[in-house]
């Protein structure tokens, strides 16, 4: 099987592809020479993909500027040029199937593949369908999705296949070596513990609310692992210099083995990006979600509300955050074991433990019938 993958800009477009590639290799359906990732040289993919040793090519492309419409003439020019380059990439690589996960770069490569009658799939991991996937839906053979709300936004109902997010299956496979929290941070593995984090870089609003709530959290009969993000760690340590933080609170810059920590957490406080939610639901971890307001179409809030509706999360809008609702939400989960158990069960129902295999089945079916 020869496959071109394309997605760019954010982790939500990249990690599902990386999970699929890993599973394809595990099942010996591809060699490294039979896959190609097409992205941009500016997005997160330009670091993640080459670092994983995956063959990588770039197209120069950018998104539409909603505030300055006149700048979009350049965007259209770049898109036309990118489709010509995409055509050449497809001709040279000769893929059996092309899979896009969103981002403008996937628009060019998947659109061109569809025109060339190469089997095509898009995968939508959010509740709100992105512009690239909305555009591509008319041309592709199959549309894989995670959230039911996303399915409602596609008019091409016959193309829809609910597969879940491939990251779900990957994170279950990675869940082999748990972090020894007693050894690493001198914490009690039998005590309720909450992990608070805002992604690898961190989230200022989440860090600020933890700072404001710290004195109250220190009095609680549970433990707190506060991952500030690499960007904010120095500032947080500086602000707390000279203050003796209680031993039930551990402040770290980043968690480098999230799948090894999540199964041990009673609760997690986090943003609601698609990749994070795939991890939480795969493992059935109760969550308090503080959606980022700085994302297109406010899709993190929609993702979070879908989780809350299913009973798998509590949601606090960033603008509504205060020490009272923040700490009481954590208390509600950590101090009520029945409630935490119900949330965990609801979360697991949303997870798709074989999501990668489901997407691969769609790929194989298209190749077989082409």
UniProtKB/Swiss-Prot annotation:
<feature type="binding site">
    <location>
        <position position="255"/>
    </location>
    <ligand>
        <name>UDP-N-acetyl-alpha-D-glucosamine</name>
    </ligand>
</feature>
<feature type="binding site">
    <location>
        <position position="126"/>
    </location>
    <ligand>
        <name>UDP-N-acetyl-alpha-D-glucosamine</name>
    </ligand>
</feature>
<dbReference type="GO" id="GO:0050511">
    <property type="term" value="F:undecaprenyldiphospho-muramoylpentapeptide beta-N-acetylglucosaminyltransferase activity"/>
</dbReference>
<dbReference type="InterPro" id="IPR007235">
    <property type="entry name" value="Glyco_trans_28_C"/>
</dbReference>
<dbReference type="GO" id="GO:0071555">
    <property type="term" value="P:cell wall organization"/>
</dbReference>
<keyword id="KW-0573">Peptidoglycan synthesis</keyword>
<feature type="binding site">
    <location>
        <begin position="10"/>
        <end position="12"/>
    </location>
    <ligand>
        <name>UDP-N-acetyl-alpha-D-glucosamine</name>
    </ligand>
</feature>
<dbReference type="GO" id="GO:0009252">
    <property type="term" value="P:peptidoglycan biosynthetic process"/>
</dbReference>
<keyword id="KW-0131">Cell cycle</keyword>
<dbReference type="InterPro" id="IPR004276">
    <property type="entry name" value="GlycoTrans_28_N"/>
</dbReference>
<keyword id="KW-0328">Glycosyltransferase</keyword>
<comment type="function">
    <text>Cell wall formation. Catalyzes the transfer of a GlcNAc subunit on undecaprenyl-pyrophosphoryl-MurNAc-pentapeptide (lipid intermediate I) to form undecaprenyl-pyrophosphoryl-MurNAc-(pentapeptide)GlcNAc (lipid intermediate II).</text>
</comment>
<dbReference type="Pfam" id="PF03033">
    <property type="entry name" value="Glyco_transf_28"/>
</dbReference>
<dbReference type="GO" id="GO:0030259">
    <property type="term" value="P:lipid glycosylation"/>
</dbReference>
<feature type="binding site">
    <location>
        <position position="200"/>
    </location>
    <ligand>
        <name>UDP-N-acetyl-alpha-D-glucosamine</name>
    </ligand>
</feature>
<keyword id="KW-0472">Membrane</keyword>
<keyword id="KW-0133">Cell shape</keyword>
<dbReference type="GO" id="GO:0051301">
    <property type="term" value="P:cell division"/>
</dbReference>
<dbReference type="Pfam" id="PF04101">
    <property type="entry name" value="Glyco_tran_28_C"/>
</dbReference>
<keyword id="KW-0808">Transferase</keyword>
<keyword id="KW-0132">Cell division</keyword>
<keyword id="KW-1003">Cell membrane</keyword>
<comment type="similarity">
    <text>Belongs to the glycosyltransferase 28 family. MurG subfamily.</text>
</comment>
<comment type="pathway">
    <text>Cell wall biogenesis; peptidoglycan biosynthesis.</text>
</comment>
<keyword id="KW-0961">Cell wall biogenesis/degradation</keyword>
<feature type="binding site">
    <location>
        <position position="300"/>
    </location>
    <ligand>
        <name>UDP-N-acetyl-alpha-D-glucosamine</name>
    </ligand>
</feature>
<dbReference type="InterPro" id="IPR006009">
    <property type="entry name" value="GlcNAc_MurG"/>
</dbReference>
<dbReference type="GO" id="GO:0005886">
    <property type="term" value="C:plasma membrane"/>
</dbReference>
<dbReference type="GO" id="GO:0008360">
    <property type="term" value="P:regulation of cell shape"/>
</dbReference>
<protein>
    <recommendedName>
        <fullName>UDP-N-acetylglucosamine--N-acetylmuramyl-(pentapeptide) pyrophosphoryl-undecaprenol N-acetylglucosamine transferase</fullName>
        <ecNumber>2.4.1.227</ecNumber>
    </recommendedName>
</protein>
<dbReference type="GO" id="GO:0005975">
    <property type="term" value="P:carbohydrate metabolic process"/>
</dbReference>
């Amino acid at each position: 099987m020869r496959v071109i993958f394309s997605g760019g800009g954010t982790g939500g477009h990249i990690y599902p592809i990386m999970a699929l590639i890993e599973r394809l290799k595990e099942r010996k359906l591809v060699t490294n020479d039979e896959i190609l990732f097409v992205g941009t040289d500016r997005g997160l993919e330009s670091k993640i993909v080459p670092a994983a040793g995956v063959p990588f090519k770039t197209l120069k492309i950018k998104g539409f500027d909603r505030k300055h419409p006149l700048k979009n003439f350049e965007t259209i020019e770049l898109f036309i040029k990118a489709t010509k380059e995409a055509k050449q990439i497809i001709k040279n690589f000769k893929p059996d199937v092309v899979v896009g996960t969103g981002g403008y770069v996937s628009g060019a490569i998947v659109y061109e593949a569809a025109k060339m009658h190469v089997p095509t799939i898009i995968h939508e991991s959010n509740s709100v369908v992105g512009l690239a996937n909305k555009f591509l839906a008319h041309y592709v053979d199959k549309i894989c999705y995670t959230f039911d709300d996303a399915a409602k936004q596609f008019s091409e109902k016959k193309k829809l296949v609910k597969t879940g997010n491939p990251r779900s299956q990957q994170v279950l496979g990675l869940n082999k070596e748990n972090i020894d929290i007693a050894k690493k941070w001198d914490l009690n593995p039998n005590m309720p513990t909450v992990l608070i984090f805002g992604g690898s870089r961190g989230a200022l609003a989440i860090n600020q609310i933890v700072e404001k709530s710290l004195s109250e959290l220190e009095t609680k009969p549970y433990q707190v692992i506060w991952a500030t993000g690499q960007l904010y760690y120095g500032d947080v340590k500086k602000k707390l210099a000279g203050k003796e933080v209680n031993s039930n609170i551990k402040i770290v810059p980043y968690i480098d083995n999230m799948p090894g920590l999540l199964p041990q957490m009673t609760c997690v406080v986090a943003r609601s990006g698609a990749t994070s939610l795939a991890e939480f639901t795969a493992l059935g971890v109760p969550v308090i979600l503080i959606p980022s307001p700085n994302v297109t179409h406010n899709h993190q809030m929609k993702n979070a509300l879908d989780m809350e509706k299913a009973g798998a999360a509590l949601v606090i809008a960033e603008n509504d955050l205060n020490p009272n609702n923040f700490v009481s939400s954590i208390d509600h989960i950590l101090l009520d074991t029945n409630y935490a158990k119900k949330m965990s069960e609801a979360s697991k129902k949303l997870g798709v433990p074989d999501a990668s295999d489901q997407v691969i089945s769609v790929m194989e079916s298209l190749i077989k019938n082409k």
